[in-house]
């Protein structure tokens, strides 16, 4: 993302293209596999409307997308979002403006259906269906694994976090504890998770 308000209109396209080139260069550097491995896997498809948008968007363009077409999985992903590089002030401002998208005040039945559909997709793609023995299993992907636990917490957070800001924890363990405290999770299940 870049903050288009910092640049005069007459150089906007030039600035936008520079940010796109820079984003591509950074992506290549951190994804490149060397003898030591790679820095970090990034997937530029995980951005607003990836088939038609550039890899680096203006803040206003991104906000417009999320306000009009953002999906439940994107809301869940932004629960954990934080600024980590670049213009931290602009990044924080973007995340603050995004809060109404993430945390809706009213119960969102479409989000509940989306969550159910995502869960079914995860189950269908589960490569390790037998979790009875953890030996040799991918603890992230098995049923009841890390992804399931995160998904459980984020789904509850999306459903109720717009009306109860105590549920807006970005760390999964903290979120589970708050969900238990607020009655969304039984304490014995908290211990198991």
Predicted features, each with a name:
Residues 1-193:
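A nucleotide- and high-energy phosphate-metabolite-utilizing enzyme signature
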